[in-house]
């Protein structure tokens, strides 16, 4: 699946290369970026999507800003960097990895403020690359932790895309699926279509199918029936932000899946890199929810699917209550309820 990596870095040409996910599965095209403005647009327009991938992309975007920042003194350089960081951070408000990656880059600049500005620019380049490489390792470790909760022969439901296309590699929710495939396990994955942008059918189903994993696409409103038929043994989803109490923001529709899973007694697992866990956000009520273009709901494939001018409510995310979550699986280990206490302990390790 190397050809379907969401993010590539060209070290020789100093360019970020992103897979255009808005045209999948019909076309596979990559777009090159070397400016903060281009990176902003790639995040806003969902050329790149998925919290981990957004964070990595933003880190490179801030490096591109640093490249053209003033070099006369650190104060002017950092002022410019902060302005561009705020600009990039405004591209999508819900995914905490975005602000996390930008803060890491800012901190790296501050740590080296006594050095020549040109040297700081090189340091930020290496820091963006480190964030990229770290994401790959985090995803693999999450998969290794998640697979301990699964068994050969299981049926797994996932929602949206927390796969390789949402991260630097492996994915979070899909990482154990790739590892199980390597082990020779026989298992089935059911991929919710995920209205309105269809990330489950256009992205998750695509990458799993290409990897030779047994995947079946279902519409979102089929999940209850599939669960009632005993076809689902576990639900695994990713996340865009986890609050301190375990409430989890993920793609719209995830909350409904969690309610169904709880009703049918099916474990609900959140695959969460620690950068997606926001201890400073107390509960899900404090998570900002992005509202997206109404036309994502009212038109598709060049045709209107609702009356022109009809009112539309199109939040990009919902919040799954912590009561509906069986475990939050991170690269540092598996966290069980009570989440408020145990997530805090996770960061004290």
UniProtKB/Swiss-Prot annotation:
Q: What is this protein's record name?
A: 5-deoxyribose 1-phosphate isomerase
Q: Which UniProt keywords apply?
A: Carbohydrate metabolism, Isomerase
> Site described as Transition state stabilizer, positions?
160
Question: Domain of life, per the record?
Answer: Bacteria
Molecular-function GO terms, alphabetical: S-methyl-5-thioribose-1-phosphate isomerase activity
EC assignment: the record states 5.3.1.-
The protein's matches in SUPFAM superfamilies, at most eight in alphabetical order, are given as: NagB/RpiA/CoA transferase-like
| InterPro entries assigned | Deoxyribose1P_isomerase_DrdI, IF-2B-related, IF-M1Pi, IF_2B-like_C, Initiation_fac_2B_a/b/d, M1Pi_N, NagB/RpiA_transferase-like
Say which family it is in: Belongs to the EIF-2B alpha/beta/delta subunits family. DrdI subfamily.
| Database matches in NCBIfam families | eIF-2B_rel, PRK05720.1, salvage_mtnA
> What biological-process terms (Gene Ontology) are attached?
L-methionine salvage from methylthioadenosine; pentose catabolic process
Answer whether the UniProt record assigns the keyword Isomerase to this protein.
yes
* Catalyzed reactions: 5-deoxy-alpha-D-ribose 1-phosphate = 5-deoxy-D-ribulose 1-phosphate
What is the gene name?
Answer: drdI
The residues responsible for catalysis, as annotated, are 240
Q: Which HAMAP family match?
A: Deoxyribose1P_isomerase, Salvage_MtnA
Instruction: Name the pathway it acts in.
Output: Carbohydrate degradation
The organism of origin for this protein: Clostridium botulinum (strain Okra / Type B1)
Function, as annotated, reads: Catalyzes the isomerization of 5-deoxy-alpha-D-ribose 1-phosphate to 5-deoxy-D-ribulose 1-phosphate, as part of a 5-deoxyribose salvage pathway that recycles this toxic radical SAM enzyme by-product to mainstream metabolites.
Any one Pfam family match given in the protein's UniProt record, by short name = IF-2B
Is this entry keyworded tRNA-binding?
no
Q: Which residues bind substrate?
A: 49-51, 92, 199, 250-251
